[in-house]
């Protein structure tokens, strides 16, 4: 049983709150007058895990980071630039990513395979290595919340807000911390997609266990958000575990295993929701919960299909309770359903029960749809499994942002 009481949100916590981590974010000239280079550094080689974009076109930094992690399953630094994706840049791009790793290793005095690199921004433009070389040489990470917040700014592209979260848990009677930071606003349809997330913890956990756990949690969190249905070339989630919390190694046999898993899931879920809420041009966060499914996978598939529907998203933007778009989207799913047993609730107001329309107050519904967080609940009445997905409305501003992205 998960000891929920032993997990507490740390207000104003950051990626440097767990023991052993420092960070920095700075402006080096990749973007106009904004921070665009950052680093997270650990005092000791940290167990790590990562998941990557499923886009068949994978950017050079992903290939280099995969190489680093595959060597020992440990990392001690992550270097990230924004403003340039270093994707679809050929062999030169791969060489530049390896050089970026080497520069970081030399600057921080680390083995090259202890350094991960990540890039985000415009695709198909060579990375300006003179700027990168000079920039990495200026990085001086600190164990201060201010520098952690600077890092969260340095990884942004079209995002309007930074995305950070932190939790404290109790394992073996000791305080253990876990925190995360993310970027992502457009081209979000993960499995991963234009999103980067970096998670730090002082938990004592080995690479293989952490990798399995992160992969499973990602399927329920980051892979269940969608902004515009596009997948990117650069995206990844990396977890670094310093092991400095003085607990026994955490694994599936540990008495507090579920506590750690729950805390990691909360961090991932918080960041996933923040990404959905900050979708390009978004004015509303949409959460879809599907109940009564035969399997969790079927529930998640339908939830994500609803939240990704352009017609549903535009209806929510227009504050229009057009539940017909929701039921139509459910019917388009590859999941076999019973068309006569579906319930739909919008903002806690029943609009469909056993697939029959329900009377409701248009005035009350209009008022509730003016809220910034919109909840759609669907019960299929086919089984006991559930699944959720998150997204945002689709506005005129989304078109404006993406039409003018390079300019």
UniProtKB/Swiss-Prot annotation:
Substrate binds at residues 157, 183, 194, 280, 402, 407. Belongs to the ArgJ family. Catalyzes two activities which are involved in the cyclic version of arginine biosynthesis: the synthesis of N-acetylglutamate from glutamate and acetyl-CoA as the acetyl donor, and of ornithine by transacetylation between N(2)-acetylornithine and glutamate. Its EC number is 2.3.1.35, 2.3.1.1. It catalyses: N(2)-acetyl-L-ornithine + L-glutamate = N-acetyl-L-glutamate + L-ornithine; L-glutamate + acetyl-CoA = N-acetyl-L-glutamate + CoA + H(+). It is an enzyme of class 2 (transferase). The record marks 120-121 as: Involved in the stabilization of negative charge on the oxyanion by the formation of the oxyanion hole. Heterotetramer of two alpha and two beta chains. This is Arginine biosynthesis bifunctional protein ArgJ. The active site is at 194 (nucleophile). Pathway: Amino-acid biosynthesis; L-arginine biosynthesis; L-ornithine and N-acetyl-L-glutamate from L-glutamate and N(2)-acetyl-L-ornithine (cyclic): step 1/1; Amino-acid biosynthesis; L-arginine biosynthesis; N(2)-acetyl-L-ornithine from L-glutamate: step 1/4. GO terms for cellular component: cytoplasm. It comes from the Bacteria. HAMAP family: ArgJ. One of its GO terms (biological process) is ornithine biosynthetic process. The record marks 193-194 as: Cleavage. It holds the Pfam family ArgJ. Keywords: Acyltransferase, Amino-acid biosynthesis, Arginine biosynthesis, Autocatalytic cleavage, Cytoplasm, Multifunctional enzyme, Transferase. The gene is argJ. InterPro entries: Arg_biosynth_ArgJ (IPR002813), ArgJ-like_dom_sf (IPR016117), ArgJ_beta_C (IPR042195). GO terms for molecular function: glutamate N-acetyltransferase activity; L-glutamate N-acetyltransferase activity.
